């Protein structure tokens, strides 16, 4: 039970720090959508809902909002609507990634470099040991800076290509 309490407390503390770092006007789903669209150029509106935890209509409203803010563009390719970030969306994502890094520093500030290294190894092990489908992996990493991981432990856990 104590282990579970520690895990929950750490998760909630990290969540609170992370949400406090969001740039003004952005929510976690906004940041997730921008992150996923940037890391999967040309993804479709249909691809997004499962990865950001919304229904199809909710994802369309999210895309509508981000488009109205000038963050993304839709391009029709036959029956598919492709998404791409505009410069303002890239700027918002860059601001989010910097804020996310600062939030990570705050969350880990009480640990020594050796303890951080140990925690990183343990988190990587925990993430890689849970088998998941590709969509679940994308969902797990929806707020990650995808270019920062040389070897992603979540990708290593994917059961399917």
Model-assigned labels for residue ranges:
Residues 17-21, 99-111, 125, 129:
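Generic non-transmembrane alpha-helical segments
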Residues 16-57, 137-140:
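N-terminal helix-turn-helix DNA-binding core of bacterial DNA-binding proteins
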Residues 1-25:
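N-terminal leader segment of winged-helix/HTH proteins
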Residues 117-161:
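C-terminal regulatory/oligomerization modules of transcriptional regulators
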